Structures are given as structure tokens and as C-alpha cells.
Regions:
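Bacterial N-terminal signal peptides that target proteins for export
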Residues: 1-6
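Non-catalytic all-alpha helical scaffold/repeat segments
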Residues: 21-238
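Bacterial N-terminal signal peptides
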Residues: 7-15
């Protein structure tokens, strides 16, 4: 499988147990997620989401638990829906027969937190345990609005998922701001993930490189130098 330095996509693809041919086909399918922002279309996103749910990774997952890959995929879908709230009930009707048990659809709707999410939730056949737990599930906006000082790996994943779903530069800029703020901090693992994912995305997608180029111009000289040093350190380590 071609090396893909995306925290978001790697978390999904790495778990796929498949032959080489199947692996390539599934990777091609999953690779449509981080490029969705180039041609956003909520119906295309729904169709892609349904196809992804049919891959072995998710068809074999009857645990009800959210792996990192499943978490990221659902965040992406939730953010697509969040940016297209008028599609909520269409997605709800389509996915009711695709997501079994419907507890997963309840989680998706809670992540999205659109005005009609509650209407969809009322129609779902979900366990009492899940229904009681739904108020504890944060929306994708809660993840993306997290203060830079307290962000962790899940927040980085949510920011990437949100950018892939919308193309909104603010999500990428927040990752760059996190790198600057934590350059001398005590969370090297999250900092490393942020640097690695940003550098990789900049190399793969010119749109992201352009966003960072413009963002650097808004920074004071000292912070601009910190960001550049953090990104350069990856190149010298290779």
C-alpha cells in the first residue's frame, strides 16, 4: 500500500485486513475522503459513506465500539452533514437500513448536531443504554472548538476531518497554531502528530500548502520562525 502520511486516513486504512488487490481498491475508496473538499456534494458524501460502511473494516465491526478509524470516518460524515443540515432527514432515512444496529446512526446524528438531528434520533431503534449515553457524546463542533492549550490527538483528527469535509482553511490554521503554541510544551506525542500530519498534507495537497503559506504571512516574525522550524525539523530527521 502506498505510504499515506495522513493521521486521519492512516488510522482507517491500516486496519484493513485484505489481499493486495482488495487493499488497493479499498484504499482508493477511502482516499476519496480527504479529497472530498475539492468537489463537495452531500449526496456524493452519503454515497461514499454507504460504500465505506460495506468494506470489511466496518462490516466486521459488530462490537458497537468506535475504533480510531471509525471515529474519524464518522466525524467526517458528521461534519459534511453539519455543513449541509438540510440533508439530515435524507441521510437519516438512507442510513437507517444501512447502519445496524441503529446505535451508530444515533452517534452520527449526535456528532452532527444539526437542527433535525433530534427528529432523526426519535425515529431510531436504539438500546436504552445508548439513548442514555447520547447526552454525553460531544458534537463535532465541540471537538473543533477545543482550546489550543488543551487539544489532544482526537481534536487533531476532528480538525482534519472537518477540513476534508468543508475545505475551510480555519481548521488547518488551527493545527498550525497548535504547533506554534506547543513547540516547547510537554506533549511531544500530540505535537509530533500535528507536525507530521501538517507536513504530509502540505506535500500531498497544494491547497493546504497554500493555506499555510498565507497563514504564515499573518504571524509575527518570531511565531513564523517557530512554525517553520518545526516543519523543517521533520525534513532534517528524514
Amino acid at each position: 500500500m502506498k505510504k499515506n502520511a495522513l493521521v486521519f486516513l492512516a488510522c482507517i486504512v491500516a486496519a484493513l485486513p485484505a489481499s493486495a488487490a482488495e487493499d488497493d481498491a479499498q484504499e482508493a475508496l477511502f482516499a476519496q475522503v480527504p479529497t472530498y473538499f475539492r468537489q463537495p456534494d452531500p449526496q456524493r458524501a452519503l454515497d461514499l459513506f454507504v460504500q465505506l460502511l460495506e468494506t470489511p473494516l466496518f462490516k466486521a465491526d459488530g462490537s458497537g465500539q468506535f475504533s480510531s478509524g471509525k471515529f474519524n470516518l464518522f466525524l467526517w460524515a458528521a461534519q459534511v452533514l453539519n455543513h449541509n443540515p438540510q440533508e439530515t432527514m435524507h441521510w437519516c432515512e438512507t442510513l437507517k437500513s444501512r447502519l445496524a444496529p441503529q446505535d451508530d446512526l444515533a452517534t452520527l446524528m449526535t456528532f452532527a448536531a444539526t437542527p433535525d438531528s433530534g427528529k432523526c434520533l426519535q425515529q431510531l431503534d436504539i438500546s436504552a443504554k445508548t439513548r442514555a449515553f447520547l447526552p454525553e457524546i460531544p458534537s463535532v463542533k465541540v471537538f473543533t472548538d477545543e482550546n489550543i492549550a488543551t487539544m489532544g490527538a482526537a481534536h487533531l483528527d476532528a480538525l482534519w476531518a472537518s477540513f476534508y469535509a468543508s475545505g475551510d482553511a480555519a481548521y488547518v490554521e488551527k493545527i498550525a497554531a497548535f504547533i506554534v503554541a506547543h513547540a516547547d510544551g510537554n506533549d511531544p506525542l500530540t505535537l509530533g502528530a500535528a507536525r507530521w500530519s501538517l507536513d504530509s498534507n502540505m506535500r500531498q495537497y497544494p491547497e493546504i500548502a497554500a493555506i499555510i503559506g498565507k497563514y504564515k504571512e499573518t504571524l509575527p516574525a518570531d511565531k513564523r520562525a517557530v512554525l517553520q522550524k518545526q516543519l523543517d525539523s521533520l525534513n532534517t530527521a528524514q
